[in-house]
Each structure stands twice: as structure tokens, then as C-alpha cells.
From Swiss-Prot:
One of its GO terms (biological process) is cell division. GO terms for molecular function: ATP binding; ATP hydrolysis activity; ATP-dependent protein folding chaperone; protein dimerization activity; unfolded protein binding; zinc ion binding. ATP-dependent specificity component of the Clp protease. It directs the protease to specific substrates. Can perform chaperone functions in the absence of ClpP. Transmembrane segments: none annotated. Residues 3-56 form the ClpX-type ZB domain. It comes from the Bacteria. This is ATP-dependent Clp protease ATP-binding subunit ClpX. Pfam families: AAA_2, ClpB_D2-small, zf-C4_ClpX. ATP binds at residues 119-126. InterPro entries: AAA+_ATPase, ATP-dep_Clp_protease_ClpX, ATPase_AAA_core, Clp_ATPase_C, Clp_protease_ATP-bd_su_ClpX, ClpX_bact, P-loop_NTPase, Znf_CppX_C4.
């Protein structure tokens, strides 16, 4: 105690814990022989909250169940039920392992990193982002195409840990429980079956560099960038408990899987489809580690990704639901933009189907929906702020097909529609 809570000649009272006078604090609470200020009370409450939080983690997992994780994923990601189940179970088990690793020292539970395989625009990145939002842990994304071996032009794999540390506000303890999503992982496949032909600094070399941080190592991370501040102290980050999720479209992998020919049906009534007649996502469901090895991933790298979740192609109905159902659906976003102009935006059901078919034709999946809507609504969003009296804008199938312009409905004369079905 710095100062006893007694009064001086001016009868000034002091906090018995921090020593501040009654004039320096908002409130001073008196006890039988001591005084405590409001700041010390708040500090004590913070300590108690942290203690309660840690005891809660010890008594319970502190993370949602797989069903709860899957339910939240349903709010943001349409379809992909199998991938959601695989991810929910894998993430739940990973954090359950973290919370109980000090209790069960007799059995060491290995980490299960995740590999997401699916066509472009099927929701791989969105699944990883939503998982990080559910679990409230630091999350970072990295592009595998920018990674090179140390010493070559490009990003080192240690930069991934630096980004995760920045997402955790340089809290090393939080960063060591975070999630790293590495996109375009198929782009670092080995360029040739013969590994000794040439130096592959962005393919097999990156796979070798990623092995260390994915399995678990203590990475030395310069918090402000090593080149600009060479004298700074390095932060030590243990990657053992960081969950790595790798995703990629793996274009051409379906041909390797089909060439195995082990998924064909047998019998007179069996319907055997040629590879070109089967959807890519359906073929991906039968992927085996040997297929990934033939694609160009090295055996050690495949071994670090024991959990494989395959995503399916999005059909027309799924794409229509993506446009309207999620909390952050594209149609809802554009309707909100039009509401700011006091205008209601309406899409006909046939128009949504036409947008979905366009995305399927372009083979861009859900990622291409925004660009399609942007091109459809560009002229309307350009003209609308300068128009008066517009109450509603209606988008029909003909508008999506490019044979008509949006229908403008005015507030003063509801029976009049401007900009009607003029040829584009």
C-alpha cells in the first residue's frame, strides 16, 4: 500500500491501493480502515472477469458444437452440406484439442489441417471467413501464387504468420490459436514429375517451405518488417496450434480422378457416364491422395492435410438462393443501395434464374454474380440520382438477356411506366 487512507491537514483522503487522492478520482469508497477508488474497483472487476473466462474454458470447451457451427454456416453459405459437416467437425475437434491438451498428457492429439477442393466460385474462401467469424479468432488469408522460397523475389512463407500476428493486434497468444487460409494452393503444384529438371522456386519449393509452419515450428517474425527495421527484436510465434485451411480449384484434377476408373457402376442397369458428362464437383468427391500426388503435390504436403472437404458445382437453384437468401445476399445489398435513393428495387423470379444461368455459362460460380448484376444495373445506378419521382425499378428476364431496359415506376402516376421494353 502506497499511502494509508488517512486524512492530512486539509482532510484529503487517498486510495489505499493506488495512492490517488479523492480529487484525482471520481469516487472513493470507504471501508473500516481502508479506502478504494473507482479505478481500482474497475481493475479488480477486469481481473475477476478474466479469471471467470479462463475457468469457463477449463470447465467447458468454450466453442460451439459442430451442429451449431454448421447452422451458422448455413446463414452465409448456400449448399455444400458435406463440406460444412467436414469443416464443422474438424474445427470443433481442433479447438477441443487446444482446450484440453494440458489435461490429457497421456495421449497426444495431432493437428488436422484442412484441404478444400472445389470449382471456382463454389464458396471455399467464404467458408473459411465465416468460420473465423464464428470462433472469434484471428484470421488471415494468403495467396499461394505470391509465395516463393526464401531468397527469391516474392513473399516468404513467414509473411503469412506476420499477417496473422497483425490480425491479432500483435497478441502472440491469440495468434497461436488463429486460422490461416491459403488460397490457390493448387498453383504451387510441382511443374514436372522429375523434381531435378530445374529449380522450382514457386512450386515444390514453396510446398517444402510450408511444411514447417503447417506441422509446427517456432517462427521468428519481425513485427515491423525485417528490411526497414533490421535492429528490431523478433517475436517468437509457435505455429503448432494454428489451424491451416488450404483451398484450390484444382483444374484438371477431375481428369486424373476419372482416369482411375474405380467409381464406375457394374451391372446391366448401371448408368455409366463419361467424364465430360459428370459435374466436376461430383468427380471431386472421389479424390484420393494418389490423385493429388499425380497433380503435383509432394507426399509430405498431402500428409499435412489429412482432412479433405470437396465442394460441389453450384446449380441454378443454388445460385438463385445465393442471390436472395444469405444475410449479406447480393440482391439485398443492391436493394439497400436503391433504398438510399428512396427507390424500391424488384427482381422478377425469371430474372434471377437468368442471372444464375449466365454465371453457369461463364463457369465463374457465385463469384461471377456480382459482375453480372453490376452490368445489369450500371445504367440505372448512373441515371437514378438525377431522376425525380421514381418509386420502383423492376428488373425482368428480358433486362438480364439484354433485350429490354429496366422498368421505372413513378410515384405521381402509377399507371405510367417509363423506359419500357425498349430494345437494347
Amino acid at each position: 500500500m502506497s499511502k494509508v487512507g488517512t486524512s492530512d491537514s486539509k482532510n484529503t483522503l487517498y486510495c489505499s491501493f493506488c495512492g490517488k487522492s479523492q480529487h484525482e478520482v471520481r469516487k472513493l469508497i470507504a471501508g473500516p480502515t481502508v479506502f478504494i477508488c473507482d479505478e481500482c474497483v474497475e481493475l479488480c472487476m477486469d481481473i475477476i472477469r478474466e479469471e471467470n473466462k479462463s475457468s469457463l474454458v477449463k470447465s467447458r470447451d468454450g466453442i460451439p458444437t459442430p451442429k451449431e457451427i454448421c447452422k451458422v454456416l448455413d446463414d452465409y453459405v448456400i449448399g455444400q452440406n458435406h463440406a460444412k459437416k467436414v469443416l464443422s467437425v474438424a474445427v470443433h475437434n481442433h479447438y477441443k484439442r487446444l482446450n484440453h491438451q494440458t489435461k490429457h498428457n497421456d495421449v497426444e492429439l495431432a493437428k488436422s489441417n484442412i484441404l478444400l477442393i472445389g470449382p471456382t466460385g463454389s464458396g471455399k474462401t467464404l467458408l473459411a471467413q465465416t468460420l473465423a467469424r464464428i470462433l472469434d479468432v484471428p484470421f488471415t488469408m494468403a495467396d499461394a501464387t505470391t509465395l516463393t522460397e526464401a531468397g527469391y523475389v516474392g513473399e516468404d512463407v513467414e509473411n503469412i504468420i506476420l499477417k496473422l500476428l497483425q490480425a491479432a493486434d500483435y497478441n502472440v497468444e491469440r495468434a497461436q490459436r488463429g486460422i490461416v487460409y491459403i488460397d490457390e494452393i493448387d498453383k504451387i503444384s510441382r511443374k514436372s514429375d522429375n523434381p531435378s529438371i530445374t529449380r522450382d522456386v514457386s512450386g515444390e519449393g514453396v510446398q517444402q517451405a510450408l511444411l514447417k509452419i503447417m506441422e509446427g515450428t517456432v517462427a521468428s517474425v519481425p513485427p515491423q518488417g525485417g528490411r526497414k527495421h533490421p535492429q528490431q527484436e523478433f517475436l517468437q510465434v509457435d505455429t503448432t496450434n494454428i489451424l491451416f485451411i488450404c483451398g484450390g480449384a484444382f483444374a484438371g484434377l477431375e481428369k486424373i480422378i476419372s482416369s482411375r476408373g474405380r467409381t464406375t457402376s457394374i451391372g446391366f442397369a448401371a448408368q455409366v457416364l463419361a467424364p465430360e458428362d459428370r459435374r466436376t464437383g461430383e468427380i471431386f468427391r472421389h479424390v484420393e491422395p494418389e490423385d493429388l500426388l499425380k497433380y503435383g503435390l509432394i507426399p509430405e504436403f498431402v500428409g499435412r492435410l489429412p482432412v479433405v472437404a470437396t465442394l460441389e458445382d453450384l446449380d441454378e437453384n443454388s445460385l438463385k438462393k445465393i442471390l436472395t437468401d444469405p444475410k449479406n445476399a447480393l440482391v439485398k445489398q443492391y436493394q439497400r443501395l436503391f433504398e438510399m435513393e428512396n427507390v424500391e428495387l424488384t427482381f422478377a423470379d425469371e430474372a434471377l434464374g437468368a442471372v444464375a444461368r449466365k454465371a453457369i455459362e461463364r463457369k465463374t460460380g457465385a463469384r461471377g454474380l456480382r459482375s453480372i448484376l453490376e452490368s445489369i444495373l450500371l445504367e440505372t445506378m448512373f441515371d437514378l440520382p438525377g431522376l425525380e419521382g421514381v418509386e420502383e425499378v423492376v428488373i425482368s428476364r428480358e433486362v438480364v438477356d439484354g433485350t429490354a431496359r429496366p422498368l421505372y415506376i413513378y410515384a405521381d402516376r402509377t399507371d405510367r411506366a417509363a423506359e419500357t421494353s425498349a430494345s437494347a
